[in-house]
């Protein structure tokens, strides 16, 4: 049996993510993991994971201070995989509005992160998702697989249009809490989830395995 080298994943450490739980989850599925904000390490890794917890504006400030916006942009321009989790997904959209304060995001995708349209907020706990049939991220997972969410804000409208037939349209996965919201996106080298795969048990482990399999 030919042994393949473990994939190297950098968990980007900019002060606003559950970096240790992400590290443990990735290591459990066979990745070689480093927690760092070092530019060269983040650029050279097979995969870059950007976790995020807290307020949208604060996460963006932390990411900019760590030059994470540049790292993400440079990796994506070279087709190098990047994955965002929770607020690490939200900051990939155009902007976020929290408590009436608007902050700019990275604008990889059009859309506004706003308060969840639900009676019970935050959305905390396990929920199912509706993934496209051709999803790579959710490959091998049943439709009733459950993932762990904890958030008060989300993207309720996916507005990106792909008119170029040579460019594959992003694959968008939805979940519902009150109104439907974006639960995950697969867009070329850039994937992201609103839920926490590192806290989602076997389903989350399968999902991370699927991501690592693309690196």
For each of these PLM feature ranges, what is it?
Residues 42-52:
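Short acidic/histidine-rich motifs immediately flanking catalytic phosphotransfer sites
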């Amino acid at each position: 049996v030919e042994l393949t080298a473990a994939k190297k994943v950098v968990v980007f450490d900019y002060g606003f993510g559950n970096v240790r739980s992400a590290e443990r989850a990735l290591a459990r599925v066979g990745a070689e993991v480093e927690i760092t904000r070092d530019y060269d390490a983040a650029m050279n890794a097979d995969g870059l994971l950007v976790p995020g917890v807290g307020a949208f504006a604060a996460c963006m400030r932390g990411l900019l201070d760590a030059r994470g916006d540049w790292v993400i942009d440079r990796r994506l321009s070279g087709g190098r995989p990047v994955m965002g989790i929770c607020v690490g997904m939200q900051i990939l959209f155009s902007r976020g509005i929290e408590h009436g304060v608007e902050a700019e995001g990275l604008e990889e995708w059009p859309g506004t992160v706003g308060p969840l349209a639900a009676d019970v907020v935050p959305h905390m706990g396990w929920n199912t998702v509706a993934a496209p049939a051709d999803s790579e991220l959710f490959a091998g997972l049943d439709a009733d697989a459950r993932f762990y969410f904890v958030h008060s804000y989300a993207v309720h409208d996916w507005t990106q249009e792909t008119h170029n037939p040579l460019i594959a349209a992003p694959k968008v996965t939805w979940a519902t809490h009150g109104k439907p919201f974006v639960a995950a996106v697969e867009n070329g080298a850039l994937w992201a989830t609103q839920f926490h795969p590192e806290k989602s048990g076997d389903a989350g482990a399968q999902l991370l395995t699927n991501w690592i399999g693309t690196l």
